[in-house]
């Protein structure tokens, strides 16, 4: 009886699910969310931590950091008690990367804006390095028009979302980006699905890159953005 064989060896081994959810660092292929079974669309990266502790940056990495943000540049923010906290931009940049690697399941509530002259390598760390480390399916490079689009479900299935070549100084752009930065949850629209709208938990960190000095308008008191120094060629564009 083929039906009995299928029921015993197939259906019982692959439980029915109500759809998919993107759940980084959940190593179960089938997982439960609020009592409902979902298939986890997150793909575990090939590269895993070794446990080794390095007390200093590799020379090539330090050279790269010096290109996109000089060592002497600081960043700062004010806390709820109005006290000011200062860090080196390179240190904060690495902390942003570390948070994406070590705790991708936790939402990142600060967006990074990397500005620089064309060809300075400001996108190399994301397009080449991070894509390999976090997994190709966990990184997405998009344009601002993709974010403005009606169907944005796929943008939430990522650990690092990179909006490339942004340059739009209209005030409404920051309002469009706001839901992609701070909230833990956001409503998404899926194309060609029965449940086109759903509430989803945001896991990605947001990065914007641009060749322009002021790619978007940000209020002086807005603490949602990390804006390091504008990178320039150290000698000439051909270097």
PLM features per residue range, with description:
Residues 158-183, 215-222:
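Conserved AAA+/SF3 P-loop NTPase catalytic/coupling segment centered on the Walker-B
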């Amino acid at each position: 009886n083929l039906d009995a064989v299928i029921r015993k060896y197939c259906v019982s081994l692959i439980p029915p699910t109500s759809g998919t959810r993107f759940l980084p660092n959940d190593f179960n292929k089938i997982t439960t969310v609020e009592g409902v079974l979902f298939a986890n669309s997150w793909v575990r990266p090939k590269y895993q931590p070794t446990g080794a502790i390095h007390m200093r940056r590799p020379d090539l990495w330090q050279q790269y950091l010096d290109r996109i943000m000089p060592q002497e540049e600081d960043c700062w923010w004010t806390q709820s008690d109005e006290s000011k906290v200062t860090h080196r931009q390179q240190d904060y940049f690495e902390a942003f990367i570390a948070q994406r690697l070590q705790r991708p399941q936790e939402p990142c509530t600060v967006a990074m804006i990397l500005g620089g002259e064309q060809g300075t390598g400001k996108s190399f760390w994301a397009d080449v390095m991070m894509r390999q480390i976090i997994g190709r399916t966990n990184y997405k490079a998009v344009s601002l028009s993709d974010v403005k689009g009606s169907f944005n479900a796929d943008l939430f299935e990522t650990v690092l979302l990179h909006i490339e070549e942004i340059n739009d100084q209209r005030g409404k752009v920051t309002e469009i980006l706001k839901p992609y930065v701070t909230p833990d949850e956001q409503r998404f629209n899926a194309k060609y699905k029965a449940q086109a709208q759903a509430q989803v938990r945001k896991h990605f960190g947001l990065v914007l890159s641009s060749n322009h000095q002021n790619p978007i308008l940000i209020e002086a008191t807005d603490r949602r953005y990390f804006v390091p120094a504008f990178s320039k060629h150290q000698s000439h564009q051909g270097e």
